[in-house]
Amino acid sequence: MKAQPKASHFIDGEYVEDSDGTVIESLYPATGEVIARLHAATPAIVEKAIAAAKSAQPEWAAMSPMARGRILKRAADIMRERNRELSELETLDTGKPIQETIVADPTSGADAFEFFGGVAPAGLNGSHIPLGQDFAYTKRVPLGVCVGIGAWNYPQQIACWKGAPALIAGNAMVFKPSENTPLGALKIAEILHEAGLPKGLFNVIQGDRDTGPLLVNHPDVAKVSLTGSVPTGRRVAAAAAGSLKHVTMELGGKSPLIVFDDADLDSAVGGAMLGNFYSTGQVCSNGTRVFVQKGIKTEFLKRLKARTEAMLIGDPMDEATQIGPMVSWAQREKVVAYIEKGKAEGATLVAGGGIPNNVSGEGYYVQPTVFADVTDEMTIAREEIFGPVMSVLDFDDEDEVITRANASEFGLSGGVFTADLTRAHRVVDRLEAGTLWINAYNLAPVEIPFGGSKQSGFGRENSLAALEHYSELKTVYVGMGPVQAPY
């Protein structure tokens, strides 16, 4: 098999196999071929991983942030040196086109290691509080053993986005990738240990929906960070609440992308396409509700249709390919069902709407699809599809579109295209979302916080803000004089 790892799990600095676990077959989404066969973690494997993390963490926490940072920066360098190899593995794992993975996946993970490796002393600083003769100070201390649970759309990136802040803050991590994309995180663990990370600090175990509760409910776990769906988030939050664990969650979205009539139309069309079709639409922050002001709707749709129909669908390993397959057959069937629902509920099909005929019949392909004349009540305008399906809605004025944009249980992200920057700032101030773009979309460099509100989660990935979620504040009061007691 072309991508078979040495073993299913990476624990305490080495590969570990346990064939008693349920078999997980990794399939190449472009062909359905089995490229690796792994095993889900048994309870014994979960215990082994958490025990390794718990044992290694105190000594790691005692190191200086600068020393920890040097290791992360070495890992970043190794990832960049092996970008092609890692990108090809990511394409095999996810089906995303190599033209995307080579610029957006391992490189983003390397950026996270470099960023957190370089900012640790400043990001973990406390404060001094003068209190007259006395004073107090605060310091940030690690939480202990952290669990990361990844999604299948950006497996390598997510492993790094969670691992980097956890490690630099002095924690140990047990990371569980999605069973759909089990391969990339193992390579990240390899690279971290090659860079000098002590054993036991970054462990990877495979698993399915039965494995997560073993991690979340474990008494030695201090914090859980999840990237996933809203239903999964609710289950994890409920389980973690029983032992008052720290929790951060980056969940789903149904984000609005608003195009006003003074916007640069080609840029707005490009933003809408990036916000719906990148990674075959499998991006949580996608602006899948595209609100277009009525005066430009016809021209917007004309340009959008032409550019969408010109996209190249095909072999993800071909650098010319722009649209690859969905991650799995089940996800393809889900997306196709939503497309049929859009047709049945009366939306106007502008482009796509079916299965492309120029690709392997065994692959999990869906055409990039655009619907117009979508209303707020339609299923495709309310529910997260997680595929290349764009809904175009029209609007008259600013107040109307803000009200409609906010009428969603989700609040992950949103965007505004307009030449009027005063209006742009006014609109984003009123949008109920955690991450917003003006005249851009879906750009998420590690220097800025990323996360949502409402049902889209809480907490932030990346930036110095992430360190607050992997540490806690300790306050120390220092008395400088005699203690006066009233008795």
Swiss-Prot record:
Molecular function in Gene Ontology: betaine-aldehyde dehydrogenase (NAD+) activity; metal ion binding
Keyword field contains Kinase: no
Cofactor, free-text remark: Binds 2 potassium ions per subunit.
Record EC number: 1.2.1.8
A Gene Ontology BP annotation from the UniProt entry: glycine betaine biosynthetic process from choline
Keywords, alphabetical: Metal-binding, NAD, NADP, Oxidation, Oxidoreductase, Potassium
Active site annotation, chain numbering: K162 (charge relay system), E250 (proton acceptor), C284 (nucleophile), E461 (charge relay system)
Residues that hold NAD(+) according to the record: G150, A151, W152, K176, P177, S178, E179, S229, V230, P231, T232, G252, C284, E384
Role description: Involved in the biosynthesis of the osmoprotectant glycine betaine. Catalyzes the irreversible oxidation of betaine aldehyde to the corresponding acid.
Homology family: Belongs to the aldehyde dehydrogenase family.
Matches recorded under NCBIfam families: BADH, PRK13252.1
Name the record gives this protein: Betaine aldehyde dehydrogenase
Organism for this UniProt entry: Rhizobium etli (strain CIAT 652)
Lineage: Bacteria, Pseudomonadati, Pseudomonadota, Alphaproteobacteria, Hyphomicrobiales
